[in-house]
């Protein structure tokens, strides 16, 4: 583990990654497609969201499971597509697939993943979905 006890926010994780990873790899991970407009808009929208916890509220038998396209998952979120994860940590793709399987959450495999969709299916069973990312340059 990379000292996860010292990471309590996204910014903590980002700062630690920036210190630990080679600059080229950090820049690849932090960047997004094209002019990064969608990424910037997502960040703006997420900055406007405030989650208020219900401290000491009685919640009996909470249900976090969800369904998507007739697939049942244990949590209402999954692992987003990320390209070249093995650059940052060898075996990261396999770890992501095994984690998705363990917690029964979906995993979307990037077109630019370090491993094949077949490998993700082998490691994570039916948790792996595929993001087809078309580039007009190659069409």
Language-model-detected regions and their locations in the chain:
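Conserved small/polar residues in nucleotide/adenosyl-binding loops
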Residues: 137-139
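Conserved, mostly hydrophobic/aromatic
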Residues: 22, 79, 100
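Active-site-adjacent beta->alpha loops and helix N-cap segments on the catalytic face
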Residues: 90, 109-124
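Alpha-helical segments flanking ligand/cofactor-binding loops in enzyme cores
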Residues: 94-98, 118
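Active-site beta-loop-alpha junctions enriched in small/polar residues
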Residues: 82-84, 112, 133-135
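An N-cap/entry alpha-helix motif that binds or orients negatively charged groups
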Residues: 2-70
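Hydrophobic faces of well-ordered beta-strands that scaffold small-molecule active sites
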Residues: 77-80, 107-109, 128-132
């Amino acid at each position: 583990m990379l000292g996860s006890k010292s990471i309590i926010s996204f910014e903590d994780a980002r700062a630690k990654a920036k210190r630990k990873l080679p600059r080229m790899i950090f820049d690849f991970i932090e960047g997004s497609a094209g002019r990064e407009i969608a990424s910037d808009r997502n960040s703006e929208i997420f900055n406007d969201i405030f989650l208020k916890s219900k401290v000491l509220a009685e919640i009996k038998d909470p249900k976090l499971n969800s369904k998507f396209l007739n697939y049942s998952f244990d949590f209402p979120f999954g692992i987003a597509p990320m390209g070249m994860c093995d650059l940052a940590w060898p075996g990261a793709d396999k770890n992501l697939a095994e984690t998705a399987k363990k917690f029964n959450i979906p995993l979307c495999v990037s077109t630019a993943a370090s491993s094949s969709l077949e490998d993700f299916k082998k490691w994570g069973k039916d948790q792996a979905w595929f993001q087809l990312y078309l580039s007009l340059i190659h069409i």
